[in-house]
């Protein structure tokens, strides 16, 4: 899904952004109970991102975005940028950002009333719908998949978990509600949201912390 979204956005912003290849390997240790999972440990993934971003810094790039499409990458990616910023702490001209494509503000259920989930899960209504739109031959018997509610009873605390703690089949959410139509709506909505956000990054003044206030982002 992330690759499709990036491709769409790149077509609109090709003269203003440079898109690196999508990384196929991330931190998926929480899925290792399911046969065939390939995962980089969190430290390996951290080191890989550290090296890649430092490469771009050495070439003179100052605005670097890590655009994420997998929940397991969220914490390591944020930590990687934190480490990089501390190593380059005397610089005031860097904008190092990490964002997840479904977390930039869009609320899909406000665009399509039949979308039921209120947050991303795993192989859920949202993801299953997008795969139905892109590669329907990869989708199995989603109509009979049981509901597995997202979230945890201890929110707002962040509970450590493995996928098997939450789901015997590996999905989280309501995949039985997925549809090709919803998938197209979601892909279009997320692509538009990513493009809007990147346009704000492009318009950053080059050294201000409070530039986000000027651009209308919550601080």
Sequence positions of predicted segments:
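Extended, histidine- and acidic-residue-enriched regions that form the cofactor-binding/catalytic faces
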Residues: 1-63, 69-219
């Amino acid at each position: 899904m992330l690759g499709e979204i990036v491709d769409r956005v790149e077509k609109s912003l090709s003269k203003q952004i440079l898109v690196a290849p999508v990384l196929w390997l991330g931190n998926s240790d929480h899925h290792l109970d399911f046969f065939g999972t390939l995962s980089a440990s969190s430290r390996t993934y951290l080191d890989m991102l550290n090296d890649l971003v430092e490469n771009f810094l050495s070439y003179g790039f100052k605005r670097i975005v890590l655009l994420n499409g997998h929940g397991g990458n969220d914490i390591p990616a944020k930590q990687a940028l934190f480490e990089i910023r501390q190593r380059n702490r005397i610089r005031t001209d860097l904008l190092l950002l990490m964002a997840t494509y479904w977390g930039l503000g869009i609320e899909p259920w406000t665009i399509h009333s039949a979308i039921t989930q209120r947050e991303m899960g795993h192989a859920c209504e949202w993801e299953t719908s997008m795969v139905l739109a892109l590669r329907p031959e990869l989708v199995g018997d989603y109509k009979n998949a049981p509901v597995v509610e997202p979230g945890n009873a201890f929110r707002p605390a962040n509970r450590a978990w493995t996928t098997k703690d939450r789901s015997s089949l590996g999905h989280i959410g309501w995949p039985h509600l997925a549809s090709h139509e919803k998938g197209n709506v979601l892909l279009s909505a997320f692509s538009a949201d990513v493009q809007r956000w990147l346009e704000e990054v492009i318009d950053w003044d080059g050294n201000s912390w409070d530039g986000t206030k000027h651009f209308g982002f919550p601080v």
